[in-house]
C-alpha cells in the first residue's frame, strides 16, 4: 500500500515484533521448511499482527487525548494568539521538528511574532528548543515525539 501511495507510512511495524521474538521467528520459519508447519507460522504471524495492532491503537488513543489536552491548554492560556497557536499545533503532527521559518509559513506571522509565539509555547510546555543556540534554533513537539520513542 505504501508502494501504491495509498499509505505514506506503514500502519503496523511488525518487524519490531519479529526482532523481539527473533528466536521463535526463525524456529517457525525453519518448521515451515522442515515439516511444512504453515499453521504454526500463521498463528505466530497473527499473534504478531494482533500485538502490534493493539500497541498502535493504544498509541493512537494517547495521541488523540494529548492533542485535545493541548488544544484546551492553548485556548485557555494563549489569549488572542490561540488561533495561530492551534494552526501551528495542527502542523506539528506532520512536522514535529521545525524552525521559526516553518512557523512563519503556516501562520503568516512575521519572524518576530512567530518567534514570540514559539517562546510562549515553550513556556507552557508544549514545545522544546533542541539546539541550545541563540541563532538557527530548532524546536520539537516533544510530547508527540515521545509516543514514538
Describe the role of every protein-language-model region.
Residues 2, 93, 104, 122-125:
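Alpha-helix C-terminal capping/helix-coil junction sites
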Residues 92, 114-124, 139:
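Basic amphipathic alpha-helical segments that dock to polyanions
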Residues 1-65, 69:
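Phosphate/pyrophosphate-binding active-site loops
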Residues 58-89:
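Short alpha-helical segments that sit at the start of domains
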Residues 97, 126-129:
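Short hinge/loop at the helix->beta-strand junction immediately C-terminal to the helix-turn-helix recognition helix
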Residues 89, 94-107:
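Short acidic, hydrophobic short linear motifs in intrinsically disordered regions
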Residues 81-82, 129-149:
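Short, cationic-aromatic polyanion-contact patches
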